[in-house]
Amino acid sequence: MWQAISQQLSETLMFSYDIVEKVHLSGGDINECYMISDGEQRYFVKINSKDFLSKFQVEAENLRLLRQTDSVTLPELVLIGNTKSNAFIILNFLPTKPLEDTENSYKFGQQLAYLHLWGEQKEYGCDQDNYLGATLQPNAWHKKWSTFFSEQRIGWQLQLLKEKGVTFGVIDEIVEVVARQLLNHNPRPSLIHGDLWHGNVALSAFGPICYDPACYWGDRECDIAMTELFGGFNAEFYRGYEDIAPLPFGYTQRKEIYNLYHILNHCNQFGGHYLEQAQKSIDKILSY
């Protein structure tokens, strides 16, 4: 496998790249991750089964979408390929550490705000479906945000769970409540990261960096809500964001709805205590 990767990388770089070092990196729940080096240039490699190739192609498209905004910093795509039994994606390797200091947290908050203010789009969705972790994320275009989020986010996750024998109530009733609570909220469609927890943000030599997006055009509050779901963001991050793009009235209540999507996705992927967390969140939303 590594010989095939080395050969394809050499063809892409147009010089012989012989792997003399490879280090297995921890933290990947879905892929096997490595740092490789020829003694001079290092790269980040994610490896999975051969049928994962299309998912890597979607990831590359998500990176392209976000990079064109010139707002947030992301890894640079080098190569997508496959061997006889594996698919892989290669990105430039950037040594990182947790994003914790106030100066860079503030800077990242501003960068995220500029991302959310970039471009113009009249509908919600994306040209292609992508993945939130290992879960397919449907992105068919919709004109109404309440329809898009209630059906393609909450309803979708609830249906996947039902197929696994897990239910939190009547799906149509939950979807209807979510749609009703978002009915009068018509946010300007923003290109969002889509999976913005602290594990997908770090500090590199070039400043704050983010990766592993699941982007689509939606409500920018979804990104901010997720940063609060699992914590880990400095208070200066939020100050930097709101100095550029203040959050509108009603965010606190909508945050519960937006984070339910990610809790349900964790139910689908991991189960466990997320099931209880999801039920509590649904009960709270139904009580509004």
From Swiss-Prot:
Catalytic site: D195
Gene3D superfamilies: 3.90.1200.10, Phosphorylase Kinase, domain 1
Top-level class of the enzyme under EC nomenclature: transferase
Domain of life: Bacteria
Keywords, in A-Z order: ATP-binding, Kinase, Nucleotide-binding, Transferase
GO MF terms, alphabetically ordered: ATP binding; kinase activity
Residue sites binding ATP per the record: N92, F93, L94
The keyword Kinase is annotated on this UniProt entry: yes
Signal sequence region: none
EC number: 2.7.1.-
Function: Ketoamine kinase that phosphorylates ketoamines on the third carbon of the sugar moiety to generate ketoamine 3-phosphate.
Family membership: Belongs to the fructosamine kinase family.
Annotated protein name in UniProt: Probable ketoamine kinase VV1_2562
Organism: Vibrio vulnificus (strain CMCP6)
Origin organism lineage: Bacteria, Pseudomonadati, Pseudomonadota, Gammaproteobacteria, Vibrionales
